[in-house]
Every structure is written in structure tokens, then in C-alpha cells.
From Swiss-Prot:
Keywords: Hydrolase, Metal-binding, Purine metabolism, Zinc. The keyword Electron transport does not apply. Pathway: Nitrogen metabolism; (S)-allantoin degradation; allantoate from (S)-allantoin: step 1/1. It comes from the Bacteria. This is Allantoinase. The modification N6-carboxylysine is found at residue 150. Belongs to the metallo-dependent hydrolases superfamily. Allantoinase family. Zn(2+) 1 binds at residues 63, 65, 150, 315. Homotetramer. The gene is allB. GO terms for biological process: allantoin catabolic process; purine nucleobase catabolic process. Catalyzes the conversion of allantoin (5-ureidohydantoin) to allantoic acid by hydrolytic cleavage of the five-member hydantoin ring. SUPFAM superfamilies: Composite domain of metallo-dependent hydrolases (SSF51338), Metallo-dependent hydrolases (SSF51556). HAMAP family: Hydantoinase (MF_01645). It comes from Halalkalibacterium halodurans (strain ATCC BAA-125 / DSM 18197 / FERM 7344 / JCM 9153 / C-125) (Bacillus halodurans).
Length: 438
């Protein structure tokens, strides 16, 4: 009988604190041994040669929309999780909206879990929704195991997940705090965005720059300021999604100093693309909050390098191809398909271009998401006793992303055509070999 189910030989292990060469052995989905390279016998189990490769903990993507049930023509657990595996992600948190019906009751949560259990290639958790009228369902959703709750402070683009006015937010946050849970927030001012959008359309200002100006940074700041005050009032932990500007980070940093229990994420598209690229790529790069000026991108990197951002998520938000076409930027679907490319962006733009330490990339993509949501040290690190979920990476392999490389149901993405350096070669999830580069 073999001692181990799988051995990763002679790779450079990267954790949140250090790097070192080792053999890593897996048994029953758990890291069973970490030893000097070459010290485990070839008779002890099947092996992957990690020579020249780096072994990262599996990424934890806390923000994806896989649209199942009800909108599997947009994505789905099978294609979405395969894309994640190809990008080095071994755990994802699926958002409650863009499936139909949304995950705002225990019944819908149970249906979604059954589908994911049947189809998902990697591990998962689910967000429950906070919407007007469902506060009485929060307890049942929590008992059903949601990782937290999600609310929108502005309209989300579909009619089946309503945004939350102040009363819903305050009542919901009080309940969520009592449950010991957390609220994730899409923070843009609904009234400001609607007013500026109406004015832009009336004046026939319909370029991508006009779209960005209709959702200005100040709309994020106004909403973030409000939700931080509500967090103080209710003692509710909050997680602010997809921040696009360092101006917002500075206010969140101040709130942390005041004792507010708040974390913040940004997304790879805000770290790679600016308004200039938005104009070149077109509607595929529409998202909310929108892409910003190049200086805002660089400032966001400064904040990231300085530790002002807790974690990186993809906010993978796919749609039918025809939803990305239309007469004006204001009419098309706002969402970017990108969950397969988060690590590639961070290695290319972070490690290679800006000399971000690999340990910091692990913190942002694996460790801090796991810690914030109570999954560490089972996930988010590589150590004996931890879950055997990791990805083997060739840091120096360069490639141009082609649509044929993507595993999404619809291989359309603003990342297509981008040049990346650093490629996932293998992904292991709970001891199972779920992806191998060809």
C-alpha cells in the first residue's frame, strides 16, 4: 500500500510568510508531510515533478457570479469551476444574485448547493442575499451555512435582486451582527449614479468616458462613508467589494483605525485596465464601479503595495455575448468575465513589473480571504494538516491569452489578447488533480 495519494516533488513552496524548496505529500485530501526535496521514496506514491515550479496555496476567490440555477446559459458551476481550476483557484464564494431566483431564502440556498455539489470541480461557499423584505430569512440562511450576506446600495442590473435602502441595511446589519456573520456591500450611491446617468443620456454623452463619469469616485465615497457609519451603529462586520480608487481606500483605512470591523477588496481589472484601455476594448470592459483614469490605476497599486487592500477577488460576472452589444455603453451588461486570469494579472503586473513579493500575492489571493471568512488554516496556507489545495506555477512562462484558452461558457473577456508572464501548470483541490496545463 502506498504511503501517500500524491507527492509534489522538489517545488519551491510559497506561503504567506516564506518560500522554501520541499517535497509535499498528500493523503486523504490533507497535507501529510513536508520534507527535504528528494527525501520521499518514489515507492511512496504517484508524483508530480515540481522542479523549477512554485507551489502556491490554492486561491480563494470570494466574489464570483456563476448564475446557477436559472441562468446557466450565462455560465454555470461546471464551466465556472473549471475556469477557476485553470486559474489556480480552489475555493470560490458564489454571489446570491444573477442566478434566478436569487439566493435570498433557505430553499434557494439548498437548491444551489445541490447543483454545485453535482457539478463543481473545486470547493465552494455561498453568499446569502440581503434585500428588502427578506430579513426574516437571514437566520435560516445563516443556519444553512452561508459564508455571509451581500447587499447592493445601488441597482444591480437585474430586477430579481433589489438594492437595499437605509432601513433595510440598518435592520439587516443589526441582525447579521447578532448572527456573528458579515455583510459584503456593493457601495455606489444609487441616487447620484441615476441622476448623472439620466443627465448623460439626455445630453447624448454616450462614450465609455461618459459612462465612467456617470459613476464617479465620489459615488463610491458617499456610499462607503454611509456603510461605515452604519457599521459603527450596528457593530456589523462589513466587506467592501471591488473598490476602484485609492481615495476610497484612505477612508476605509481611517475607519479601521477607529475600530470599524471592515475589510476591502479590489479586482484585477482595476489593476490592469484604465479608461484608455476601456475605450480600446469597448463594451467587454464595462463594469461597475467603472474603470478609472491611468493615474487612479497607479494610485490603487500604491495602496495595494502599502497593505491598504485586504484581498483580491475576480468579481467574475459573465453574460450572454449579445448582452455585451448594444447601441450605447449605458445599455449593455456591466460585468467582466475574468476569474481564470486573476493570478496571471498579479504575477505579471505585481511580481514581474512592480516587484511585489510572492508572499504578499499569497496573502492577497489565499491567506487573507481564508482568514477573513474563517477558513484558515484549513485553507490559505501550506502546512501539515492543512487542506491539500494548491497550484503549481511556472513564474516565467509568457503567453498571449487567446479565447480558446478560456473555459468559460462564453469565452469573451477583456483579458483576451493580453500578454501575461506566469502560468498555472497544475491545480490540486483537496488532494484531487483538477487541472493540468497542456
Amino acid at each position: 500500500m502506498k504511503r501517500f495519494d500524491l507527492i509534489i516533488r522538489s517545488s519551491t513552496v510559497v506561503t504567506e510568510t516564506t518560500t522554501y524548496r520541499a517535497d509535499v505529500a498528500i493523503r486523504n485530501g490533507i497535507v501529510s508531510a513536508i520534507t527535504e526535496p528528494g527525501s520521499i521514496s518514489s515507492d511512496d506514491g504517484p508524483a508530480i515533478d515540481g522542479t523549477g515550479l512554485h507551489l502556491f496555496p490554492g486561491m480563494v476567490d470570494v466574489h464570483v457570479h456563476f448564475n446557477e440555477p436559472g441562468r446557466t446559459e450565462w455560465e454555470g458551476f461546471a464551466s465556472g469551476s473549471k475556469s477557476l481550476a485553470a486559474g489556480g483557484v480552489t475555493t470560490y464564494f458564489d454571489m446570491p444574485l444573477n442566478s434566478n431566483p436569487p439566493t435570498i431564502t433557505r430553499e434557494e440556498l439548498d437548491k444551489k448547493r445541490q447543483l454545485a455539489n453535482e457539478k463543481s470541480l473545486v470547493d465552494y461557499r455561498f453568499w446569502g442575499g440581503l434585500v428588502p423584505g427578506n430579513i426574516d430569512h437571514l437566520q435560516d440562511l445563516h443556519d444553512g451555512g452561508v459564508i455571509g450576506f451581500k447587499a447592493f446600495m445601488s441597482e444591480c442590473g437585474t430586477d430579481d435582486f433589489q438594492f437595499s435602502h437605509d432601513e433595510t441595511l440598518l435592520k439587516g446589519m443589526k441582525k447579521i451582527a447578532a448572527l456573528g456573520s458579515i455583510l459584503a456591500v456593493h457601495a455606489e450611491s444609487n441616487e447620484m449614479v441615476n441622476a448623472l446617468t439620466t443627465i448623460a443620456i439626455e445630453e447624448q454623452r454616450l462614450t465609455v468616458k461618459d459612462y465612467s463619469e456617470a459613476r464617479p469616485i465620489v459615488s463610491e465615497l458617499e456610499a462607503v462613508e454611509r456603510i461605515l457609519r452604519f457599521a459603527q451603529l450596528t457593530c456589523c462586520p462589513i466587506h467592501i467589494c471591488h473598490v476602484s480608487s485609492r481615495k476610497v481606500l484612505k477612508r476605509i483605512k481611517q475607519a479601521k483605525g477607529e475600530g470599524v470591523n471592515v475589510s476591502v477588496e479590489t479586482c484585477p481589472h482595476y489593476l490592469l485596465f484604465s479608461l484608455d484601455e476601456f475605450a480600446e476594448i469597448g463594451y467587454l470592459a464595462k463594469c461597475a464601479p467603472p474603470l478609472r483614469e491611468r493615474q487612479e490605476v497607479e494610485d490603487l497599486w500604491d495602496g495595494l503595495m502599502a497593505g491598504e487592500i485586504d484581498l483580491i477577488s475576480s468579481d467574475h460576472s459573465p453574460s450572454l455575448p449579445q448582452m455585451k452589444t448594444g447601441k450605447t455603453i449605458f445599455e449593455v451588461w456591466g460585468g467582466i468575465a475574468g476569474c481564470q486570469n486573476t493570478l496571471a494579472v498579479m504575477l505579471t503586473e505585481g511580481y514581474h513589473k512592480r516587484k511585489m513579493p510572492l508572499t504578499q500575492i499569497v496573502q492577497l489571493l489565499s491567506t487573507e480571504p481564508a482568514k477573513r471568512f474563517g477558513l484558515y488554516p484549513q485553507k490559505g496556507t501550506i502546512q501539515v494538516g492543512a487542506e491539500a489545495s494548491f497550484t503549481l506555477i511556472d513564474l516565467n512562462e509568457s503567453y498571449t491569452l487567446n479565447a480558446s484558452d478560456l473555459y468559460y461558457r462564453h469565452p469573451i473577456s477583456p483579458y483576451v489578447g493580453q500578454r501575461f508572464r506566469g502560468k498555472v501548470k497544475h491545480t490540486i483541490c483537496q488532494g484531487k488533480h483538477v487541472y493540468q496545463d497542456h
